[in-house]
């Protein structure tokens, strides 16, 4: 009776279970984002953008998103830019999700039933790169559908 073999087998089973659960979580969270920024924190701790692929438009003219955001200082918005998933070079325009909550932002380029790649990102005055000038702490979470 070999103890090492049993330990290895248990470890392999544990890894397989962990992989399966993380895959399931990944699939359900494919269209959701959780962004956060804290001034002074290491950049690896700040999540300023997330790409989501193949989000199917449910309506003509806009993609719908739910967004909740917390902003402790300064002006803040989450920007979302959509691109046709068939070609990343065709820009489908952009819309803003403000920290007051969201509505359906109009954009005539979106077509119902087509899939789009979307990026949700922190943005201040037109770009998420200068967020540190205006905001000391902010977070946003939501999903596209």
What are the residue ranges of the model-derived segments?
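Exposed aromatic-hydrophobic patches
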Residues: 51, 100-112
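Exposed low-complexity, polar/acidic, P/S/T/G-rich flexible segments that act as propeptides
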Residues: 126-145
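Noncatalytic modules at the cell exterior or secretory-pathway interfaces
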Residues: 59-65, 109-128
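Non-cytosolic beta-sheet module surface loops
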Residues: 54-57, 67-71
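Extended, low-complexity, turn-rich repeat/linker tracts enriched in Gly/Pro/Ser/Thr and Asp/Glu
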Residues: 68-77, 128
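N-terminal prepro-regions of secreted/extracellular proteins
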Residues: 1-56
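Short, surface-exposed beta-strand/strand-loop-strand elements in extracellular ectodomains
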Residues: 73-88
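Solvent-exposed serine/threonine-rich low-complexity stretches and specific carbohydrate-binding patches
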Residues: 38, 88-102
